[in-house]
Every structure is written in C-alpha cells, then in structure tokens.
Amino acid sequence: MPNIFDKGMGYISPEDKQVRILARDNYRIWITLIHICLLLLYINVSSAQENRESAGVWGDQQNGTYKNPVLNADYSDPDVIRVGDSFYMVCSDFHFMGMPVLKSNDLVNWTIIGQVYHRLNIDSKYNTMEKYGGGSWAPSIRYHEGKFYVYFCTPDEGLYMSTATDPAGPWSPLYEVKKTGGWEDPCPFWDTDGQAYLGHSKLGAGPIIMHKMSSDGKHLLDSGTTVYEGPTAEGTKIYKRNGYYYIIIPEGGVGTGYETALRSKSIYGPYERKIVLEQGKTNINGPHQGGIVDLDSGESWFMHFQGVGALGRVCHLEPVKWVNDWPLMGVDNDNNGIGEPVSEWAKPNVGKKFPICAPQTSDEFSGKQLGLQWQWNHNPVDNKWSLNKARGFLSLSAMKAPDNKHAKNTLTQKLMGKLGVVTTLLYTDQMALGQKAGLCLLGGNIHEIGLIKTDSGIYVYADNNGKLIIGKTIKQNHLFLRARVDLNNNHTILQYSLDNKNFIQLGDDCILSDYNYWKAVRPGLFSYNIKQDTGVAQFDWFHYQHDGPSGGLH
C-alpha cells in the first residue's frame, strides 16, 4: 500500500497528489491521535537532543543567550514596539509586495504574522516591473489607544499610513497622508497631552523635520519645522522618557555610520547630540537605524540593522543602559562613553522561556493562501497564479517577458543565514512553447535553474547572470531543482535531479551580487514566456534548509 502521508519526498503525479490530500482529510482524526502519541514519546525521549539540533549558528542558542544577528535575513530598516507581553516589528521591502509584520515574545525568536498590504496601487509602474528601488522605504510602527499604526514613504509618490486593531490584520487600505516626493523614514508620535506629531527626513538623508499631525494620524497640520541637521541624518524614531524628547537616528551612511541620540525638553529643540553606538573594534560595520523597547524588568533593548552584502541588511539586538538620561547601546569596551555592538549576549529578561523559532520559509502549497513569507516582485497579476487550479500546487501562468527582471509574478522570499539549500519540484505537463520556469536567485545578478520548452522538447537549463547553459532533454513530466547558497564564499551552485536523490550541477558556480535596489538576493519561483502569453508551471512544494534556528542545516 502506498504511503499516503509521504508529502513531497519524491515524485507524485498531480492526480495521485489530490487523492492523497483527500485521504488526509478523511483520516484527520486518526492522524491527529497518532501524532499526539508520537509527540509525547518524542518529548520524553529526546527533548534535550531536540534543543541541541534546533539551535542554529545565529539567534537563540537555547542556553539563555543569543548570537547576533538575531534575524540573519534582509529585514531592512526595522522598527520594533512592545505591546503588553509581545513585540512587533516591521521593515522596508521596497518593490516587493508587501510589508511583513513580525511577532516575538522575547525579541530573539520571531515569526511572521501578517502583511500590511499586498500591492501598491499608487503608480502603474508597479504593474509593469519599472519600480525597482521604489515602494516602501523605512517604516515605523506605533500603538496608540488600542490601534496599531504603520507609516512609510515611497521615494516618488508620498507618505502613507495603515491601521489595524490586530497586528496580524486585517490592515486598513493604505491612506495617502501627503502626496509628495523626496521624503523618507517617517515616525509618528502622540504626546502625553494628546497632540500628535510626525518626524521624517528627506531623500538623501536629512534634515530631520517635525510636523504637527491630527490625532487620527491622517493629516499633517503644518509645513514642518527643521529640528536637526547632521551628516546623513535619517531613520527618525521619536520617544519620550523622563521629561526628555528623544530622536534616535543613524548618521554617517549605511556602511560606515553610527547611531546618534538627540534629546531636548521640547519636541522642537534645540537638541543635544550624542553618539551612542559605533562599530569600534567589532566587525559590525555601520550599526544603523532601528527601534528601542523597554521591558517590565527594567531592561531596554535596541534592534538595528547591519548591511552585509548579498544577504542584505540583517537585524542585531543590543542591550541598552541609560546613563545620565542618555542611552548607551551595546557595550562600552574602550570606556569612551560610546557603545559597541555585541556578538553574543544574555537574552532579554521577559520572565518566561519561549520555544525557538525563525520566520517561515518552506511551503507545501496545500493551503488556501500563500505562506506569509512570500512576496511578489512588483504587483502580482492575480488571475495568472493559483493554489486552486490544481489543489496542492502553486500554478504560475506564464506572461511574455524577455528575461527574469521583467517577468511578472515571480514569487520570492528572503534568504535566511549564510548557508542554505533551496529545493522545489516542478511539473511540465502544461508548459508551452517558449516558456521558462523554475527556481531563481533574484538580485543584482540573476541566476536561474529551470526548464525551457522548445520545438525539439523540454530541456533543463541554467542561466548564470546572462550566461545560458542548456542541459539534457527532460522526458519525464517533473524535475527537482535546487540552489545551494554559500554566502561565506558569496556563491551558489545550481543543480537538478530526476529522483530527488542524485543532484547534478549545471554550469559554473554563480557569484552572488551585493544587495541591489536596496534589497538582498532572494530565492524565488518564476514562470515566463519569451514568445507569448501562454503556459503554466506547477510547483509541488518549496523546501528551504538554512543555518539558523530550526533551520535544519547546522
């Protein structure tokens, strides 16, 4: 009897897969009971081993400490808040749709719980693959009177906000607070007297400008007052503590800068200035913008990013000590009054221990919706993809495009950590003449491993940033595709397999580019046609092993 629960381990025909899904539905109670028994046995016998295997080379170490970066992925321009016992984070994602909302119980282990938006209907160029580097720049998230607020600017279109009573969503449709170009990095602030403000910088970094804002956060009430000018001042985050207004900003540039605290008894200044975090003798270059949170235990913490090439801008967590009403971030190793980033530290004291986790990656495509980890490159064409056309498969209909950069409906997610193995299973039954489909690494350089249908048959191919390598004819109706990512050496290997056991490299090792258009290299699934709008690629599953918490690759 075939194993009807053997999901995604090898070849399954589309018809067999749907039979298996129905079988799983019919035997759900039976399966659940078996799983409970196995889970209890597993916990009793091997919980210690599980802990050792779950910890990765970054994040939670399962011994009361963490290793930076706590999020070793391109969560650029992070902002974080605490509401009750939970922490929430948002980040910029530019031309990728849309903006993820993450949740943590301890500032170290994070999972994706929602998306603020799924498309940008503010310029037709987001539909035509012409807004690389546009979209959402550095956002801020705040909580005020029972409601979550997210603000961000796009470089060309304006200042936008969205609200939700539940950070997992639904979020309100994007509201245009101001139609303008050249603004960046907004942050709202509601003072204790009820007056609302919004601070921001201008494209190119600086100056810092403060506006009065309506209490509902939808309208700016004046033209703004410049409160600070400094070297590449950006990333405005506003706080109030012990009678001081604080503006926390990065200065000096993404790669070589530092973190600055400004403080004043008036929100309009004048502001005192102090550098509070610098690279020092560490290898954490340019510690950049982020957010501060306070804990009930009395601790304070700062989440910020570091730019690290092809992996993008990864998130570090620093302890914060308040000295004479100034924040000292990290550890002052040389006693110069300025903190330096920590590489490993005791986890925040939140009063409890929580399970290890990392943002979602793998997907079986068996649900009714895409996993929250997925983001389309530019706006999706919604009638050209489906999880329902063939149940248990992601179906991507091909549209005409000359190459991957201009192809619509490329589905991507973030690289996790420096080492990773990404594998997918692609079916060819509905592919059309001229169609290309497969697995890509999308960045400044674009690399593909996939299938192309020609007059003479279907061939496996690799595209190493424009260097095309055509492999053998594929006569079966499916192929396993794999990318082995090694960011320690900044390259990836493209492979394919007929049986998910023996993988063959096609072409030379690929050199991965540094982050491009402000975003890191991303794995993705693609389907486009160089001749016509026709053909469908069916992806059975997407599996991702990485070197982080619960990543399975250590």
Region annotations inferred by a language model:
Residues 48-554:
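Carbohydrate-active catalytic/glycan-binding domains of CAZyme proteins
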Residues 1-4, 8-14, 19-50:
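Bacterial Sec-dependent N-terminal signal peptides
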